[in-house]
């Protein structure tokens, strides 16, 4: 039969199927391994039978952990969804009952062989055997009667002989013994004969009894066998009739099922499920309704059963994506799933935080229209200098590249624009061939402007330029200058810059050059420069200012006074500094960079010993040849000490201080002090100090630093320093 649905069934998550009132092992059930069991619940669940354990237990595969509650079910015994499968089931059922009909026929043949005539013959034979036994018994009884007669006859003869003997005693005494002997012999012979006959009769009777017993037993056994055979035959006949009836019923059911099949309603293998009346409902029943193929090159998978949510599409071309069920809106694949997070280029760039690289020309677009908002940020190209006009927001009429970077200042439109013009610089240095001209940022120029989110306008373009070498810091080869004239002419011919120059007559000079209008137009005649003429030295003595007038002439350089090349004396005045030692009353001291290494010791009242120097340094600003000591003064500008000094043979200095009065001054300005007269030795007052300008030896700490800087610079120029760093 095509379907089996007896009883109810349930299924565990491990694939075990339990049945109630089922007969799954029954051969007539036609259940085989590989058959499909369908649980009739919502949604329908399917499983494939892998083992038939018992009438009430099956094992199933392909369950995916599904369970089914106890309820109605149906087992598809074969490919019952097709005519071929149904025919196979009907044929198998008929074959089963045909095999049973053979057994029934055999049983009927046995019954035919055991008909009543044969049974009667067997009974008559048994009865005949019984009559023969009874006849044998009668013969034995006759033999016994004959023996008895012989014995009686012998007795009669004996009696007769006795009578003869008695009658002839008197007349035949001589023959008495012989007669007795004869009689005795006859008697013995008779007795022997009688005994023999009696024994034979008894043996015959016993034999007859044994034969009769065997015949009786055989007859009883045969009767029992016949009865059993009859019973078996009757049972076989009944079973055959029952089986025949059941076969007829099953055959009728199969025929009815076959007759009830409408070929138009059957699914055929060749039809590939095309005959389903309601394909959509069938998909739901089989839990595949979320899969759809509206055309040959497109496959869709929906997010829910009623197809009202979203769907995933895949085309044969390889295109795929997610969208609403009706296709009205595409859905982006999130960044967390490996997507861009957007369905447009703008959304994707926003989600991934990247900027647009648009290699199409800006054309006639105004640069003010490209802001930090929306799809504005990115990199743009302008290939036409003719279109790069001021009316379109360009800083100069040159083709170039525009970079737009959002900065979020007070709104989404806030951004920074940077425009880099393209300029042909001529022949590529490595080729010398005019055909190998190449474009790069001309003269290191680029422009920047900004826009605030709450302001509709951009700021003016701000130009940025470097030296003619294209770098903010120049290389020795490009900025080698033969003289100061060559150096200042280079400053005049280039835009504002930060650079260093190797002036042959001086050494390395660092310069910050600010050009009027960035050197354009009349900007070549006006400029201002801050320079360090002793770049490789560890001091600030040669930090200078230069200025160019409108006529293009450079003015004399002006030294910038600073804490590195000046000192403040005890009276608060600035003086040009070299090695300076400040001495305090208690013997403590203070040095600057150049006097580092000097020490001071108070050796007595008003006497201080300075070691580590080579006497005083003569400088007109410090009093000429005999100068070099700055004396503290009062508020009226009058010295409050007398100072003297001695130079020791090793160059160390002894500074001596004495009390100093001004007797001709008003009383408040005479500097009188109790216990001290004018010229008495006295310590330096605690609120002032004496500054001494000293001469330092060549091996002083400062001079060693200067020499080390010079050597390092020479090593850097020669490349030795870089190589030493590589080897460390």
Curated annotation (Swiss-Prot):
The keyword Membrane does not apply. Its main location: virion. The keyword Ligase does not apply. It is found in: Virion. One of its GO terms (cellular component) is virus tail, fiber. It comes from the Viruses. Keywords: Host-virus interaction, Viral attachment to host adhesion receptor, Viral attachment to host cell, Viral tail fiber protein, Viral tail protein, Virion, Virus entry into host cell. One of its GO terms (biological process) is adhesion receptor-mediated virion attachment to host cell. Probable tail fiber protein. This is Probable tail fiber protein.
